[in-house]
UniProtKB/Swiss-Prot annotation:
The protein, known as: Occlusion-derived virus envelope protein E56
Keyword annotations: Glycoprotein, Late protein, Membrane, Transmembrane, Transmembrane helix, Viral envelope protein, Virion
Listed GO CC annotations: membrane; viral envelope; virion membrane
Main location: virion
Region (Disordered): 355-374
Family named by the database record: Belongs to the baculoviridae E56 family.
Gene: ODVP6E
Taxonomic superkingdom: Viruses
Organism name: Orgyia pseudotsugata multicapsid polyhedrosis virus
Positions of transmembrane segments: 155-175, 319-339
InterPro entries the UniProt entry points to: Baculo_ODV-E56 (IPR006733)
Amino acid sequence: MSFFTNLRRVNKVYPDSASFIVDNRLLLNTTPAGFTNVLNVPSTRNLGNGRFEPGYNLSNNQFVSAGDINRITRSNDVPRIRGVFQGISDPQIGSLNQLRRVDNVPDANLHVKRTRGDAVKQSFPETNVRSAEGVDRALQQNPRLNTYLQGAKAAGVGVLLAGGAYLTFSAATLVQDIIRALNNTGGSYYVRGSDGGETADACLLLHRTCQRDPNMNTSEVAICANDPLVSNTAQLQAICSGFNYEQEQTVCRQSDPAADPDSPQFVDVSDLLPGQTIMCIEPYSLGDLIGDLGLDHLLGEEGLVGKSSNSSDSVSNKLMPLIWLIGAVLFLALVVYLIYRFLIKGGGSSTTNAPPVVIVPPPATTNLNPQQQI
């Protein structure tokens, strides 16, 4: 069996510690280099009532659950991987890519979309909206995004989102198209990877989705025909019993394999193939939609005034080296001129202002007759 198959097998609650130790030995046989320093120190957390959560003791005596190990390695959460597996190298982290491809693990691409959406909402708070007014305002503040989506609407090309909903362009306005797509997101999803995990097929698990958007159109959403883990109807209907969003802060139950086993959100997926998973996706905001579609590069100020200003700035930037050269030449010429005026013109002026020296020749000597002298 593969690494992710064996890792998935220990993502559950055990009746005793010994059973986990046995399964972990099989996991170690398929563990790639760089990860054994943690996985060879198995431990459990006693949940009471004959229930034990499997996990591992880190060098700082911190306990990390098998569910968390599954989550960070399946989703390629590199910062968390480095935090747990101290001293691991880039090639060792990269070795997981091939292992994910072998088992069609889809989590990494979904993690990228989610992380990108979070970054969009943090950097561009105006996109963290779900209302028509908020979406319209955000589009006006990000005209490049608006222009791109208007072009997509004109082309009439629909896009499949991570949660199985579609962004289609059939409403009267772009804002209406976006709002309809946002309304159709949020819930518990059964996800199956293919093409090395690059492609993911997702469908909505209605019985695990405890709060849907009131405007969700289920005819536009892929709904799972059956639950992949539970076939008993009464058991499925009981999942959302007593649900309270204000307390639980999520729209799902039994949809998070890495959740605390004592919480209503935990689900045991150890029987699923490694290329399959159940996950909760919270209702999208505009920022989540942008991150899902990978359009974050179109964000930023460049409105009509901005475009004109940016255009002028672009021309100025191109001419700036020439302007500096001309300025330097003119400055040098001015310096030379001032030096010339001081040394040459200034010296001539001093001579002119001095009183002139007139050399008068002495009078000629004339011999006069004595009579003329009388």
